[in-house]
Curated annotation (Swiss-Prot):
Entry's family note: Belongs to the archaeal FAD synthase family.
Transmembrane segments: none
Protein name (Swiss-Prot/TrEMBL): FAD synthase
Pfam (any one): CTP_transf_like
Organism: Methanothrix thermoacetophila (strain DSM 6194 / JCM 14653 / NBRC 101360 / PT)
Phylogenetic lineage: Archaea, Methanobacteriati, Methanobacteriota, Stenosarchaea group, Methanomicrobia
Length: 143
């Protein structure tokens, strides 16, 4: 920790921003004094369809959110690079992020990084609270 300041790091793709993203970031921000967000690089998104919105635009959108103090693009080669550079006290994962908390904490410790991992399990109850749902609705109604 930086004195009494707690830095929280949230990560994600943030493709087609929606209320679910906002809830995740609001809950993440509430855990500390500063929220830094790592936006996934286009090339690194392999666990789901590639983002519709390019990484530079996703970064710009996330940076503009009032609860976000800083947003950066992730590393192309090493997911731990931004963690080493920004030294968060807490790393949050969204309810649907595929990363296992125990594995992540173990990997952080191996690298001498002491951030605590917190899963934000709350979900926003809305019809279009995922980028996939938004894309599917657009395809259904507009194509």
């Amino acid at each position: 920790m930086r004195g009494t300041m707690t830095r929280v790091m949230a990560t994600g793709t943030f493709d087609i921003l929606h209320p679910g993203h906002l809830l995740y970031l609001e809950r993440s921000r509430a855990l500390g004094d500063e929220l830094v967000v790592v936006v996934a690089r286009d090339i690194n998104v392999k666990h789901k369809p590639r983002p519709v919105v390019p990484e530079d635009q996703r970064l710009r959108m996330v940076s503009a959110l009032k609860m976000v103090d800083m947003a950066v693009l992730g590393s192309v080669t090493d997911i731990f690079e931004p963690v080493r550079a920004l030294r968060p006290d807490i790393i949050t994962l969204g309810y649907d992020q595929y990363m296992d908390e125990n594995w992540l904490e173990g990997e952080l410790r191996k690298r001498g990084l002491m951030a605590r991992v917190v899963r934000i399990s709350e979900r926003e109850p809305c019809e279009l609270c995922s980028s996939r749902q938004i894309v599917e609705k657009i395809l259904k109604e507009r194509c």
